[in-house]
């Protein structure tokens, strides 16, 4: 029974899943939007939104927790200085998932684009 087991396994080991979502979260924070499968986008939202909430607190402990999750000092600085200030007055819902019309060519997987809802983020500052 799968009672209280949240999250998709995506046919990967736990370490592979952790690395996949760490890389996807880093790319989303770096570029502002990425295209991926619909299932991965929905799971990525569960990782990125708490990171932005953490960045809104803007203290040393929050930075250390964000680095623990992201693993890159430059991206942590970008998250805290550029991404989070755009969401100061937003109570939640920092990302938007848009389903794309075309499916992936190889396996016909449903694709989606995940992006930040606020577009005032400067991508060039990394």
Swiss-Prot record:
InterPro entries hit by this protein: Ribosomal_bL17, Ribosomal_bL17_sf
Keyword Membrane (UniProt): no
Coiled coil location: none
One Pfam entry name: Ribosomal_L17
GO cellular component terms, A-Z: cytosolic large ribosomal subunit
Superkingdom classification of source: Bacteria
GO terms, biological process: translation
A molecular function (GO) term: structural constituent of ribosome
UniProtKB keywords: Ribonucleoprotein, Ribosomal protein
Keyword Ribonucleoprotein: yes
Family affiliation: Belongs to the bacterial ribosomal protein bL17 family.
Subunit relationships: Part of the 50S ribosomal subunit. Contacts protein L32.
Name listed for the protein in its UniProt record: Large ribosomal subunit protein bL17
Protein source organism: Lawsonia intracellularis (strain PHE/MN1-00)
Gene: rplQ
């Amino acid at each position: 029974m799968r009672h209280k087991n949240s999250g998709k396994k995506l046919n990967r080991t736990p370490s592979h899943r952790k690395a996949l979502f760490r890389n996807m979260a880093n790319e989303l924070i770096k570029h502002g939007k990425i295209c991926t499968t619909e299932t991965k986008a929905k799971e990525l939202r569960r990782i990125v939104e708490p990171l932005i909430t953490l960045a809104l607190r803007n203290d040393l402990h929050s930075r250390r927790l964000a680095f623990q999750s992201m693993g890159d000092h430059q991206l942590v600085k970008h998250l805290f200085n550029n991404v989070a200030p755009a969401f100061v007055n937003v109570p939640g819902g920092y990302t938007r998932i848009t389903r794309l019309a075309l499916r992936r060519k190889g396996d016909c997987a449903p694709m989606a684009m995940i992006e930040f809802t606020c577009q005032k983020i400067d991508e060039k500052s990394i």
